[in-house]
Amino acid sequence: MVEPMNWISEVVRPRIKTLFKRETPENLWVKCPDTGQMVFHKEVEQNHWVIPGSEHHLKMSATARLKMMFDEGTWIDVPLPEVPADPLKFRDEKRYVDRLKEARAKTGMPDAFKIGFGRVGSLPMTIAAQEFGFMAGSLGMAGGEAFVRGAETALEKRTPYVLFAASGGARMQEGILSLMQMPRTTVAVRRLRAARLPYIVVLTNPTTGGVTASYAMLGDVHLAEPGALICFAGPRVIEQTIREKLPDGFQRAEYLREHGMVDQVVHRHQLKETISRLCGLLMDVRRTPEPGTAPEPTTPEPLPNAA
């Protein structure tokens, strides 16, 4: 009698459970990191990935950011240059080319930047958004080329350039080729400044490493989303190095605002209105040359190549 009972309990019953099991989507609910509150995924998505009640700002895809910003959620994608996929033939636990394939399949993007041209509050604007889901939004040759192409688009169309930064820093798989994007993007920002075009940076969670050390902190105005981690080295690394406990909220948007590194902390729902107003004011000011000065050239020298 033992064998039939084992067969029933080990084979028949699991099959019955599987047969009548009710399918529940894995992404039906979203859990708030602050309060543990469970919210419908669709409700959070409709709220621009802000948890209702706690107002916790979750990570947001690059495409969702452009849709949130541009009037009627429509824009023209700026074509981005192609770069060598794996010039160093890098391999750690996986080959770099395999990591790229996985990231592209996961995000549907060729790399960690998406750039669009459209209107925000009826004002023409060029917007670049980093995709943290693509290898932590790390900066490589493709990212550097994308940022520069966005700046060139803003120069060509005479629009403000807005960046939504979200990155873990330089992409280690590209070595020095990644690091050289830091000065290249800095030159692109200088070209915008020479042409008297606004460059607005929105620091989102997280913005760290080489991105913080370059174009993310070179804006005319720095906005930040609530609670965003903004730093070069993260708090855990610093605590392990100095063997001391850091202050509460250290390197968060509000802390940086209090210490003058961020101009304003803005709720995600107010970003479009705030950026539209800022860019409108800056464009009005910069259209008029200062008394006694000649207009700045709008086509400065071309940037150096990525490689």
Curated annotation (Swiss-Prot):
Keywords: ATP-binding, Cytoplasm, Fatty acid biosynthesis, Fatty acid metabolism, Lipid biosynthesis, Lipid metabolism, Nucleotide-binding, Transferase. It catalyses: N(6)-carboxybiotinyl-L-lysyl-[protein] + acetyl-CoA = N(6)-biotinyl-L-lysyl-[protein] + malonyl-CoA. It is an enzyme of class 2 (transferase). One of its GO terms (cellular component) is acetate CoA-transferase complex. Acetyl-CoA carboxylase is a heterohexamer composed of biotin carboxyl carrier protein (AccB), biotin carboxylase (AccC) and two subunits each of ACCase subunit alpha (AccA) and ACCase subunit beta (AccD). Component of the acetyl coenzyme A carboxylase (ACC) complex. Biotin carboxylase (BC) catalyzes the carboxylation of biotin on its carrier protein (BCCP) and then the CO(2) group is transferred by the transcarboxylase to acetyl-CoA to form malonyl-CoA. This is Acetyl-coenzyme A carboxylase carboxyl transferase subunit beta. It comes from Methylorubrum extorquens (strain ATCC 14718 / DSM 1338 / JCM 2805 / NCIMB 9133 / AM1). The gene is accD.
